[in-house]
């Protein structure tokens, strides 16, 4: 095979070729490392030998040789003693094995003992070799330590002696460490040997108990009783199974003790050991494999219905014809004329052959069975002869399902318990059972006998899938059922796919809506941020705006009243054109301003004339009133004000700026007394210039606003004829407009100081007063001036 480059490779034939190469390389590296370690060990041994030779040349070499000889003798004595102990142990083990061979006739135990003996011998040899090696290392360590001491004691300052002493000390330390490690290994091996002995003792104890049970069973065997032979055969099978299980367990345990590079290793603490549960499962599996299938009654998974609880039940089987049915219970193939099968309810499984006379007597003594037989004869679709018995004593049925996990299995049990029992086979010569006939027989015989089940495995009456094969189904019906199942599978798959697609669509739609919601939230945040920025820019630009300062001199007229827009705009937090603080939206005139003090701009009041005059009116000139030609109908609604003496050139408002171009004189209050019946003008400190009017807007004022909006007038339209007092005194100016009284301020000195004295409506400086027109006429100038007493303005 060739790859994309056109080169042949072995990937298809050797999938683990690269891994094998890596493993080989690793093995080669490990082998090289082992060789290097061996070379280093050889070099160390050579150095030690050289050191020993140099030490022998010392002056105390004779004493050293004597000590070495004594140690060698002690070592030889220890070896001889160990050999004698080994021989004694081997003899004892052989005697013990002979005794066990005499007691244990099986081969498995002998093999176990042999394996145990070999394991013990190996462990003993290893322990002896380890002890001998440890003794040798200890001796060499002692020699090296002695040599080191001798070298250090008799050193004459030579550099060679110092080097020899240091090397000898290092070698002694290494040997002591190896000796300690050997001792630890020996202790671990002894512990593992004890664990193995305990396990083997447990296995041997079980074997001895099993052998004793076998001997007792052999003594109790009786060749005459068939039942005893069957039970003994079962016990022997169990014993053999247990022996095989023990043998396998011991073999598995011995396989754990695997030799690796010639070193016998015992099982570590982390290796899995055999537990009683594993032994039990092994015994069960071997028992299932070794035991033969026995033909036990009621093997099909159901039990015959208990017709009578205490008396015997007999069923007569008169087989006069040889049908092709496969449910025959007799073992012979010829036609039987009178076979009687008697089943005892007390002892199930005992079969006896009785004579026809005994069967007839039992039938006569059991009236219930006679009734049942009568019912059996009256079953429709039954032949003249009775059919075979459906209780299969020898073996299970061949053409019926024996599963109890579905509804069809329960039907089969009722069919076998009912139809065959009462002789309703309905055979038509072809061996096919009639299921409907059997159900009819069961219904006529009794409802209590068709719903029986086994106590061990009760039949479930719930739903469930029917078995794949049924005896009473033709090939056409099976084909139809298969086609129907395939069609149902395809429909279920389509339904699942449709559900999945719908779920995916809904999830996508939800994701889209969530994304849209997030986008809208972001857009709202952006718009709010821009609004805040624009508001901040407007607030920052308002103090320096030249247009706002030019509007301070403009005047708006509403229903005959004057409203300074400059003061309105500066006193209402900078909202010059539109302020949305709860104003009346029913105003039809789009040229009027909306005040933040919740006043109706169509009611004819002076708005915005508040404390802002303190900051704006002091440095500005008086209001400039210019005549503008407007409609005559609107001029009729303008109220003529009396002459204000405070607006002359001697007032305090004229001190800061140039004089106005034109002014108009207002008439006195006395001339308007006959028309001021409903006029209430507050002059006290509590009264405010912002006096709202109650009622609807005048109709004459709203007529001009509906067709088209007009521009806001900047000045008050005053005719020359209105400037004369004689014309004002005539009284042509209306005091009411559509039933709404007109309220105007009283005639007084309305300069800045008088307004600051408490007439601005900010905070009352005295008790509440209700002024009248008479009080206004008698005391027109009761407002305090800065010359008489200080100001009484109270700030919040």
From Swiss-Prot:
The keyword Iron-sulfur does not apply. One of its GO terms (biological process) is embryo development ending in birth or egg hatching. Residues 506-534 are annotated as: Leucine-zipper. Residues 480-499 are annotated as: Basic motif. GO terms for cellular component: nucleus. It comes from the Eukaryota. Keywords: Activator, DNA-binding, Nucleus, Phosphoprotein, Transcription, Transcription regulation. Residues 402-429 have a biased composition (Low complexity). It is found in: Nucleus. Residues 478-541 form the bZIP domain. One of its GO terms (molecular function) is DNA-binding transcription factor activity, RNA polymerase II-specific. Developmentally regulated transcription factor AP-1 binds and recognizes the enhancer DNA sequence: 5'-TGA[CG]TCA-3'. May play a role in the function or determination of a particular subset of cells in the developing embryo. It is able to carry out its function either independently of or in conjunction with Jra. Homodimer. Heterodimer with Jra. The kay-Jra heterodimer binds more stably to the AP-1 site than either of the two proteins alone. This is Transcription factor kayak.
């Amino acid at each position: 095979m060739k790859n994309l480059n056109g080169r042949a490779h072995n990937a298809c034939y050797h999938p683990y070729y690269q891994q094998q190469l890596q493993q080989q390389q690793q093995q080669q590296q490990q082998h090289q490392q082992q060789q290097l370690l061996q070379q280093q060990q050889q070099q160390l041994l050579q150095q030690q030998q050289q050191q020993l030779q140099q030490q022998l040349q010392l002056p105390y070499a004779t004493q050293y040789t004597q000590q070495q000889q004594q140690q060698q003798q002690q070592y030889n004595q220890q070896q001889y003693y160990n050999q004698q102990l080994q021989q004694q142990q081997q003899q004892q083990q052989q005697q013990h094995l002979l005794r066990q061979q005499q007691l244990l006739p099986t081969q498995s135990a002998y093999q176990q003992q042999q394996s145990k003996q070999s394991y013990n011998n190996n462990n003993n040899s290893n322990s002896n070799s380890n002890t001998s090696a440890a003794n040798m290392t200890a001796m060499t360590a002692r020699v090296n330590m002695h040599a080191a001491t001798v070298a250090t004691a008799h050193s004459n300052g030579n550099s060679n002696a110092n080097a020899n002493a240091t090397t000898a000390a290092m070698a002694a330390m290494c040997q002591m460490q190896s000796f300690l490690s050997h001792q630890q290994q020996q202790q671990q091996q002894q512990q593992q040997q004890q664990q193995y002995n305990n396990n083997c003792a447990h296995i041997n104890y079980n074997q001895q108990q099993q052998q004793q049970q076998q001997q007792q069973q052999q003594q109790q065997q009786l060749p005459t009783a068939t039942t005893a032979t069957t039970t003994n055969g079962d016990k022997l099978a169990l014993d053999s199974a247990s022996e095989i299980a023990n043998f396998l367990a011991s073999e598995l345990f011995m396989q754990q003790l695997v030799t690796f590079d010639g070193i016998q290793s015992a099982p570590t603490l982390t290796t899995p050991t055999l537990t009683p549960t594993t032994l039990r499962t092994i015994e069960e599996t071997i028992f299932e494999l070794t035991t033969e299938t026995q033909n036990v009654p009621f093997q099909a998974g159901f039990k015959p219905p208990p017709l009578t609880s205490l008396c015997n039940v007999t069923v007569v089987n008169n087989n006069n014809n040889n049908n092709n049915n496969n449910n025959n219970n007799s073992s012979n193939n010829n036609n039987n004329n009178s076979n009687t099968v008697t089943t005892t309810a007390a002892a199930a499984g005992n079969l006896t052959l009785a004579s026809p006379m005994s069967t007839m007597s039992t039938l006569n003594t059991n009236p219930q069975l006679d009734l049942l037989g009568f019912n059996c004869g009256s079953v429709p679709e039954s032949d003249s002869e009775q059919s075979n018995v459906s209780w299969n004593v020898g073996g299970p049925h061949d053409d019926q399902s024996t599963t109890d996990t579905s509804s069809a299995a329960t039907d089969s049990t009722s069919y076998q318990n009912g139809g065959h029992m009462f002789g309703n086979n309905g055979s038509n010569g072809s061996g096919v059972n009639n299921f409907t006939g059997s159900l009819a027989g069961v219904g006529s015989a009794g409802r209590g006998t068709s719903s029986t089940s086994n106590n061990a495995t009760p039949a479930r009456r719930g739903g469930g899938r029917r078995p794949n094969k049924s005896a009473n189904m033709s090939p056409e019906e099976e084909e139809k059922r298969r086609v129907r199942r395939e069609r149902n599978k395809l429909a279920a798959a389509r339904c699942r796919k449709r559900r999945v697609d719908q779920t995916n669509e809904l999830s996508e739609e939800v994701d889209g809506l969530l994304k849209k919601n997030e986008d809208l939230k972001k857009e709202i945040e952006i718009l709010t941020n821009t609004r805040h920025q624009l508001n901040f820019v407007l607030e920052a630009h308002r103090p320096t705006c030249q247009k706002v300062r030019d509007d301070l001199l403009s005047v708006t007229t509403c229903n005959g009243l004057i409203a300074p827009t400059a003061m309105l705009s500066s006193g209402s937090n900078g909202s010059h054109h539109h302020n949305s603080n709860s104003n009346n939206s029913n105003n039809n005139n789009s040229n009027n301003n909306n005040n933040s003090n919740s006043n109706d701009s169509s009611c004819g009041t002076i708005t915005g004339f508040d404390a802002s005059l303190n900051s704006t009116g002091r440095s500005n000139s008086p209001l400039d009133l210019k005549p503008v030609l407007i409609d005559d109908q609107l001029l009729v609604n303008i109220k003529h004000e009396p002459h204000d003496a405070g607006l002359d050139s001697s007032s305090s408002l004229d001190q800061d700026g140039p004089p106005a171009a034109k002014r108009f004189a207002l008439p006195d209050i006395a001339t308007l007394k006959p028309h001021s019946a409903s006029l209430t003008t507050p002059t006290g400190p509590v009264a405010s210039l912002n006096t709202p009017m109650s009622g609807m807007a005048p109709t004459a004022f709203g007529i001009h606003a509906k067709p088209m909006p007009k521009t806001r007038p900047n000045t008050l339209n005053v005719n020359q004829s209105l400037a004369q007092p004689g014309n004002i005194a005539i009284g042509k100016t209306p005091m009411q407009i559509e039933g709404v009284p007109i309220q105007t301020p009283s005639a007084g000195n309305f300069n800045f100081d008088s307004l600051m004295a408490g007439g601005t409506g900010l905070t009352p400086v005295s008790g509440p007063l209700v002024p009248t027109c008479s009080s206004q006429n008698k005391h027109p100038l009761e407002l305090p001036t800065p010359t008489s007493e200080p100001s009484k303005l109270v700030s919040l």
